[in-house]
Structure formats: structure tokens, C-alpha cells
Amino acid sequence: MSKKITKRMQALLDKVDTQKVYDITTASVSVKSLASAKFDETVEVALKLGVDPRHADQMIRGAVVLPHGTGKKVRVAVFAKGVKADEAKAAGADVVGDDDLAEEIKNGNINFDIVIATPDMMALVGKVGRILGPKGLMPNPKTGTVTADVTKAVNNVKSGQVNFRVDKKGNIHAPVGKASFDAEKIKENVLELVKMINRLKPATAKGKYIRHAAISLTMSPSLELDAQELMDAR
């Protein structure tokens, strides 16, 4: 049985041509016209990559600092001691600690969106890995969240760093702004994300790298993007 389309969704579908393939400039304008919620909806990009994540060398994972941020206020927790803890606090980290922070996590007190750790703290972080991992909060060198440079890491996250990774089917979903953003800022954020993903293309990947791409709002239908245009972004 096909899912019934609501009046709200039908009204949005009437505004755009969902069968069309959009260039990123047009899509950035058109997706803004689909804002209909009572909150500032998130703009999200979905990419289907021509990779097989079952192979370690094709597990695409990374991070990029969007030029205009995501529009979301991010709470950051940092595992660090001594001078590094002081640096994290000075940089604006919301929660900083070591054993005490691990204890808070064990007790279910997770009031943050990103976790950063200095390398010497990873043994401790590993003890709460079963809790952080499923929530996507485990620090990782590939996303710049395991580092001795906590000042830079905190600044990047607060400035709009987006962490991404392919799922089992080769898909990447990432926020690239808010519906209230200017269309040009949405476009520039999308291109910055795609440029990073292009740089991470595995040498062993076969065929077309970006198989399908789409942009949407939290509560809107998606618009198909020109995958070739995105693959050409450098």
C-alpha cells in the first residue's frame, strides 16, 4: 500500500519539479522555497557513493569545516588533563574532564554533541566506548577529534565542522546549513563538503564515484542534484 501524501507535502511537491535534476545553484534557491515548518529546518545533503564499505580502504570517513557553519549550536566535551584541559576550556569547550567525565557518561549524563580527546586519554575513552560508539560520539583521528591540538579541534567544531562517514550501503548524509541561510551560503557549504569527499575517493573505487545526490530540508521532499557537477568540484 502506498503511503498517503499529506496536504502539506502535496503543497510542497506542487512548488518544485521533483523529477528534474538540479544544478547546485538552482537547488540552493529552490530548497529554501520548501521551508514550511515552524522551526528553522536543517538543509541536508544525501550522497550515494560508488564504494563498498565492506573493504576497509573504501570506508569513507572524514570531517570538514563548512565556511558558513551548520547553524546549529554545538556542545563539545573534551577528555583532557592539565594544560590541555585548560586549553580546551579557554577555547570554549562546554565540558572538560577525565575520570570524572567518564563517570558522568557511565551514569547517562550525555549533554553534548561532539567528543574530543587528547591521544593520552584514549585508553580512558575506550572504557566508555560501548556508550559513545552507538551514539556516534566516539573520538576518531580521521575526524580530527583525537588530537593534541585541542584548541584547534574545539574551534573547528564550534565553527561548523561536520563529521561524515558512509553507511553500510555507501550513503553519506550531512547537514549543510539552515533554511534561513542565503542560497549562496548553502551552495558554498555543499561544495566544501563535496570537495572533501572527492579528495577522499579511494584508488580502488570502481565506476562512477557519486552515483546519486540530493538536497532537502528536515520536512521537505528532496531535489536531485547533478552528480557530475559535484564530482567535478575541486
Curated annotation (Swiss-Prot):
The GO terms this record gives for MF are: rRNA binding; structural constituent of ribosome; tRNA binding
Q: Please state what the protein is called.
A: Large ribosomal subunit protein uL1
- What NCBIfam families does this protein map onto? rplA_bact (TIGR01169)
**Which species is this UniProt entry from?**
Wolinella succinogenes (strain ATCC 29543 / DSM 1740 / CCUG 13145 / JCM 31913 / LMG 7466 / NCTC 11488 / FDC 602W)
Record-linked InterPro entries: Ribosom_uL1_bac-type (IPR005878), Ribosomal_uL1 (IPR002143), Ribosomal_uL1-like (IPR023674), Ribosomal_uL1/biogenesis (IPR028364), Ribosomal_uL1_3-a/b-sand (IPR016095), Ribosomal_uL1_CS (IPR023673)
Family recorded in the similarity comment: Belongs to the universal ribosomal protein uL1 family.
> What is this protein for, i.e. what is its function?
Binds directly to 23S rRNA. The L1 stalk is quite mobile in the ribosome, and is involved in E site tRNA release.
Per UniProt, subunit arrangement is: Part of the 50S ribosomal subunit.
**Which keywords has UniProt assigned to this entry?**
Repressor, Ribonucleoprotein, Ribosomal protein, RNA-binding, rRNA-binding, Translation regulation, tRNA-binding
Q: Which HAMAP family match?
A: Ribosomal_uL1_B
Q: Which domain of life is it from?
A: Bacteria
Q: Which GO terms describe its biological process?
A: regulation of translation; translation
Keyword tRNA-binding applies: yes
